[in-house]
Design a protein with these regions (language model features):
Chain A
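The feature captures the beta-strand-to-loop junction immediately N-terminal to the Walker
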Residues: 33-35
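Helix-to-loop junction immediately C-terminal to a conserved catalytic motif
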Residues: 48
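Conserved ABC transporter NBD signature motif
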Residues: 56-64, 73
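Conserved ABC ATPase "signature" region
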Residues: 109-127
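Conserved ABC ATPase signature
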Residues: 131-135, 139
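H-loop/switch region of ABC-family ATPase nucleotide-binding domains
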Residues: 191-192
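Conserved beta-strand-loop-alpha-helix hinge in the C-terminal portion
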Residues: 211-234
Length: 266, 277
């Protein structure tokens, strides 16, 4: 379990995160949503142990991040950054994936085997010998997914994972997230992409100015009459479901089109 | 007359077996906005590099065909003229921000072009106001969010009023409300100033109401080009992030009945009043 207890963080002026307490359980999919600059990424970095709270505590399986070595934290928590350029530095794609594995003590051959498997999963096998920084923006992003997937942490944090991704990559990402959840991992996503998150109906924390202003499942969020106060863009499938008067909103275009077909054309 | 003409352009990066661009041709009339879409790795960035002359100047490989900007071959235009003709906003604002303070960053290009101080101050103030980031003018760039940085990067390019503006996924780091605002603001500014634009976007819905044309790329080739609404309706592939309501219509009715989301919701409203959802 990841547990935040009355956590505060500041970059110098005012609090970027202010008094947040919450728990994330194993096998849960949790989304942090909110505007640019609301504090979502800061919360993600606190949970990944990259930054430490100035007040309060972050516990990862009862380890307080303030007095735990970062190498022990990364075995449990993997974070995929919004900007892939921040985490790519090796000379080839294959070595990039192997880097973290070798640091965790895997033998070179085993690390290579694990890296190759992960590159296959993300359709990057053909790029194994290319320099990471020569890849396109979308490919670099996929590479960062492959890196974290390879080292298999218990908690995986995706910071704005849909940025710069085409439809196929998003479909692959959806499959990956569902598989991770099924295998008992916790997946934490910070995003402003409600259209993407909607299919999962995740446990959602709405963040404004470093505070949690709403929490619950995403379906509930957009079925509230006053959701517009959070300035979040409603997923189109949610809006169409409401227009159709559906008691349970459809989570996918397939589901919704079947409902529409069932009731005849407009 | 076109601001951009790409004629039978092919390019293969040195050492790569496949063509990154394969006989690409397209024209963009003055004052028009085009979305360039296609899956990751299809050649969009390579095409932008060729349009800006970076290919073949800085990337080695086999180059055939030509790119004309404002009627002139991009390879014969001096660097100074090119900078005034084409404005390029990178996908990642970190790649183009060089100053410490927002205001200085936005003024940087104009200072380099040698304009006088009053002109620069006036232009910089106006563009910051037009983009709604005037209150950020004295902030150090490092204190801004990614979204705010992107707006500053856009301001720094728009302030130079290029003939052709290239935006490489300009709103990918912005939340939808901010993205829509940037899209409509950029649209308003470029229409007022008569600037043409090429926008690379995965989230087509953000700019689909503003753009005139759309080009779809796949494996180095242009597979469709034309009026954006028609291209979106024709599109049957699996690569583009088509808006959810378009997807629903195609799946439910086999065609697109309403091209704007609001229109589709109104249709549903009207039909439910007639007793049919």
């Amino acid at each position: 379990m990841i547990r935040l207890e009355d956590v505060y963080y500041t970059y110098g002026t005012g609090y970027a995160v202010e008094g947040i307490s919450l728990e994330i359980n194993e096998g849960q999919l949790v989304a942090f949503v909110g505007h640019n600059g609301s504090g979502k990424t800061t919360i993600a970095k606190l949970m990944a142990g990259i930054i430490k709270p100035v007040k309060g505590s972050v516990f990862i399986d009862e380890m307080d991040t303030k007095n735990t070595k970062h190498s022990n934290i990364v075995r449990k928590v993997g974070m995929v950054f919004q900007n892939p350029d921040y985490q790519l530095f090796e000379s080839t794609v294959l070595e990039e994936v192997m880097f973290a594995l070798k640091n965790m003590g895997y033998e070179k051959e085993k690390a290579k085997e694990m890296a190759i498997k992960s590159l296959e999963m993300f359709g990057l096998s053909g790029y194994a010998q290319r320099p990471p920084l020569s890849l396109s923006g979308g490919e670099k992003k996929r590479l960062t997914f492959a890196i974290v997937y390879a080292w298999d942490p218990k908690y995986i944090i995706f910071d704005e994972p849909t940025v710069g991704q085409d439809r196929k990559n998003l479909q692959n990402l959806s499959v990956m997230i569902n598989e991770l959840i099924k295998s008992g991992k916790s997946v934490i996503i910070t995003s402003h992409d409600m259209e993407f998150l909607w299919q999962f109906n995740p446990l959602t924390y709405v963040i404004e100015k470093g505070k949690v202003v709403w929490s619950g499942y995403m379906k509930e969020l957009f079925s509230q009459t006053d959701f517009s106060m959070y300035n979040l863009t409603e997923p189109q499938l949610s809006a169409i479901s409401r227009k159709l008067g559906l008691k349970q909103p459809a989570l996918t275009a397939e589901e919704l089109s079947e409902v529409i077909k069932g009731v005849g054309s407009i | 007359m076109h601001v951009l003409e790409v004629k039978n352009l092919s390019f293969t990066y040195r050492g790569e077996p496949k063509k990154a661009l394969d006989n690409v041709s397209l024209n963009l009339p003055y004052g028009k906005v085009m979305i360039l879409a296609g899956p990751s790795g299809c050649g969009k960035t390579t095409l932008l590099r060729a349009i800006t002359g970076l290919i073949p100047k800085f990337y080695e490989g086999e180059y055939k065909g030509e790119v004309l900007i404002d009627g002139k071959n991009v390879l014969s235009i001096t660097q100074r003229d090119l900078v005034q003709s084409i404005g390029y906003v990178f996908q990642n604002p970190e790649n183009q921000l060089v100053s410490y303070i927002v205001e200085r960053e936005v003024a940087f290009g104009l200072e380099n072009m040698g304009f006088d101080k009053d002109y620069i101050i006036n232009k910089t103030e106006n563009i910051l106001k037009e983009l709604g980031i005037y209150e950020l003018r004295n902030r150090p760039l490092r204190t801004l969010s990614d979204g705010q940085k992107q707006l500053v990067a856009i301001a720094g390019i728009l302030v130079m009023e290029p003939k052709l503006l290239i935006l490489d996924e300009p709103t990918s780091t912005l939340d939808p409300a901010a993205a829509k605002k940037v899209a409509s603001t950029v649209d308003q500014i470029i229409r007022n100033k008569g600037i043409s634009a090429i926008i690379v976007e995965h989230r087509i819905d953000i700019f689909s109401d503003f753009a005139d044309f759309m080009a779809v790329m796949e494996a180095g080739k242009i597979t469709d080009f034309g009026d954006i609404k028609e291209v979106l309706e024709r599109y049957s592939g699996d690569d583009l992030r088509v808006p959810a309501f378009i997807d629903v219509q195609k799946k439910a009715y086999g065609r697109v009945i309403a091209r704007k989301f609001e229109d589709y919701l109104s249709l549903l409203n009207a039909s439910s009043k007639r007793g049919k959802p």
